[in-house]
Each structure stands twice: as structure tokens, then as C-alpha cells.
């Protein structure tokens, strides 16, 4: 009813569920505007940048190619106001976004896009430039002299694990297949038996089907 398009939805007992809803997002669609504003309000109302992460459901409604634009919206309240002025006439009746004057600093952006997610995931060698870090480094042009979105969309230099992969804004032809990053957080091992009981009562498959076997570890 929202879009008039066909949709697909499926559920397989309690193991999985998936769905496809084709959406054409439009500036003058109030529902779409509120969807967008909800995320922006969370970013701007949560005072501690360590408690919010810049992440999207790529490649669906929020491709990561939009990160530079999102960063500009967070760092520049004037640009945010100009964008809001083109939205649905009743936008301000349903959201507080227009009244929020906060602007993210470069440090805030580094936290929500790098340091915060790495810390939350327990990746001790990611998200910082200290001893033992993997030397994942991006070098940008000066934000004060350039459009924010353009700066973040086109880094001047990028180092991945200490190896340069972007030079003078150009991608070098030395990329390799990436690695799967894993972490091993501490937990109460007694919880496994409780989960196993639930599997036996409610699931059609065994909990052992969820374990990752050794043959998948070669790229970890």
C-alpha cells in the first residue's frame, strides 16, 4: 500500500526470514522523509559519539557510497537546512530535525565511523593509530577549503594494513582479496546448554549446524 509495488516475503520456521520491498525514495514523499529524518535525529540527539555508529544496510536502502553525503549532513547544519527546505511541506510537523543545530566535528566522525565500531566489535588492532594497530589510514584534503562530501568521497591517500592502495586520489592496481575479521568475546559458557534446550524444543535443526567448521578458516 505504501508504494503500490509488488513485494516478496518469506519465513522459514524460526531459522530465517527475508523480504524484498521495491522502494523509490522521493524528497516530496512524507513517509520517505520521516524514514530519513529518523536516522539523522538519532545521530544528532545522542550526545556521546561512542554510542552511535555510522552504518547502513548496504546495498539496499543505504549504500555505503552515501557515507560522504551523510557525513556532510552531520557536519554542516546550513547544508542540512537547505536540504530540508526541499522536503515535504509537513516535514516539521513530524520531526525535530530542523531545530537541531548540532554539527559533528572531524573527531566525532572518526569515532562513529572507525573507533567506535572497532571497539564495540572487540577489534583491538582496528580504529586507532596506536602501537599494534593495522595501519589502516586515510589521508584527506583540508575540509575547510573543500566540499565535505567531496573530501570524504575522494581521499588523497589510503593505506590498508600499511600498504598504499590509493595514491594522489587514484586507486592502485595492487588489491588483494580481503580477510574476514573475527573476535572472541568472553561469555558465560553455561548459556550454551540453555540455548541448546531451546533449539531442541522449537527449531527443526540442531545448534551444531550453526558452528563454523575449520575449512572456512583459511581467509580469517
Question: Where are these predicted regions, by residue range?
Answer:
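Active-site microenvironment of metallo-dependent hydrolases
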Residues: 45-52, 62-220
Amino acid at each position: 500500500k505504501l508504494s503500490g509495488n509488488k513485494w516478496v516475503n518469506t519465513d522459514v520456521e524460526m531459522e530465517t526470514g527475508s523480504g524484498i520491498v521495491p522502494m523509490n525514495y522521493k524528497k516530496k514523499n512524507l513517509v520517505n522523509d520521516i524514514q530519513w529524518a529518523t536516522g539523522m535525529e538519532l545521530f544528532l540527539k545522542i550526545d556521546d559519539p561512542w554510542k552511535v555508529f555510522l552504518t547502513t544496510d548496504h546495498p539496499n536502502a543505504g549504500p555505503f557510497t552515501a557515507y560522504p553525503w551523510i557525513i556532510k549532513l552531520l557536519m554542516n547544519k546550513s547544508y542540512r537546512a537547505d536540504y530540508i527546505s526541499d522536503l515535504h511541506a509537513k516535514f516539521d510537523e513530524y520531526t525535530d530535525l530542523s531545530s537541531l543545530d548540532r554539527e559533528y566535528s572531524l573527531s566525532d566522525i572518526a569515532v562513529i565511523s572507525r573507533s567506535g565500531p572497532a571497539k564495540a566489535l572487540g577489534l583491538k588492532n582496528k580504529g586507532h593509530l596506536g602501537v599494534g594497530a593495522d595501519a589502516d589510514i586515510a589521508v584527506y584534503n583540508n575540509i575547510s577549503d573543500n566540499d565535505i562530501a567531496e573530501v570524504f568521497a575522494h581521499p588523497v591517500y589510503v593505506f590498508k594494513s600499511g600498504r598504499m592502495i590509493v595514491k594522489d586520489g587514484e586507486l592502485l592496481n595492487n588489491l588483494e582479496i580481503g580477510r574476514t575479521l573475527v573476535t572472541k568475546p568472553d561469555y558465560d559458557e553455561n548459556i550454551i546448554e540453555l540455548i541448546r534446550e531451546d533449539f531442541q524444543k522449537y527449531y527443526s535443526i540442531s545448534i551444531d549446524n550453526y558452528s563454523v567448521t575449520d575449512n572456512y578458516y583459511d581467509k580469517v
